[in-house]
């Protein structure tokens, strides 16, 4: 439009309240504003809530399919909250997540923002990484959320967030999802004492640590001697942890 401005040989009369005459030069001035209003109206109609829940719209670059749990692809996100306010995130990455759940038709995802975001508001983490849980194996869609709420009621120190939303991915409605915390070490998540790295001969290696009882042996993992239970060490990271810390954890768990 900028390279081909409209040109008229005669004036155009537009019927308005004042019955005024709009010249071609005036039209050139107001046309960008009119196009902006049309664009805003179209955007408002495009990003609306599907139900009474918030709706998350994610569009990947070139509508690329999400096929990997390891490789992120770029995307944008529009978050329509309960009050129909729209938050726009124009630079994020998304990939698959989960173990057995990744093989189901309704897949879970992990999103990573360019900067830390307080997606769920006050009292929740400000972080780059968040998860979209599909709850595909749960017909009620509520077991994970109920477990989190029960943990809060019991006074557990950390309970993953449980915010239900509708997900639209590349224009396709995917159904009900749950925005949840990526389980990692930070305030409002797993808030443990982080160790000073690199370690010295006098460093205190008694904690904190972040371990997971896992059914899958991946990452920095060991198996308990008595019950043969896989334990995964999430913190310190695999590239940061040293031999003395690994041995301390194994001895502590198997005592």
Model-found features: residue ranges?
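Phosphate/dinucleotide-binding and metal-coordinating scaffold of catalytic cores
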Residues: 45-255
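Bacterial Sec-dependent N-terminal signal peptides
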Residues: 1-7, 13, 17-46
């Amino acid at each position: 439009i900028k390279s081909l401005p409209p040109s008229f040989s005669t004036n155009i009369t537009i019927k308005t309240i004042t019955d005024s005459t709009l010249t071609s030069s005036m039209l050139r001035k107001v046309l960008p504003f009119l196009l902006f209003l049309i664009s805003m109206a179209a955007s408002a109609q495009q990003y609306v809530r599907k139900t009474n829940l918030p709706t998350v719209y994610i569009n990947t670059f070139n509508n690329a399919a999400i096929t990997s749990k390891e490789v992120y692809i770029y995307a944008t996100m529009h978050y329509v909250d309960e009050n129909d306010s729209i938050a726009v995130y124009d630079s994020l990455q998304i990939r698959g997540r989960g173990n057995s759940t990744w093989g189901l038709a309704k897949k879970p995802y992990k999103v990573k923002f360019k900067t830390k975001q307080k997606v769920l508001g006050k009292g929740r983490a400000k972080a780059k990484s968040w998860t979209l849980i599909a709850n595909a194996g749960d017909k009620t869609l509520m077991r994970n959320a109920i477990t989190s709420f029960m943990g809060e009621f019991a006074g557990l120190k950390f309970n993953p967030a449980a915010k239900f939303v509708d997900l639209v991915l590349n224009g396709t409605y995917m159904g009900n999802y749950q925005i949840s915390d990526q389980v990692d070490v930070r305030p409002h998540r797993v808030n443990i004492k982080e160790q000073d790295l690199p370690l010295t001969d006098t460093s205190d290696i008694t904690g904190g640590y972040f371990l997971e009882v896992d059914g899958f042996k991946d990452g920095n993992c060991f198996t308990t001697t008595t019950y043969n239970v896989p334990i995964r060490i999430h913190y310190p990271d695999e590239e940061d942890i040293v031999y003395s810390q690994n041995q301390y954890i194994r001895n502590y768990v198997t005592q």
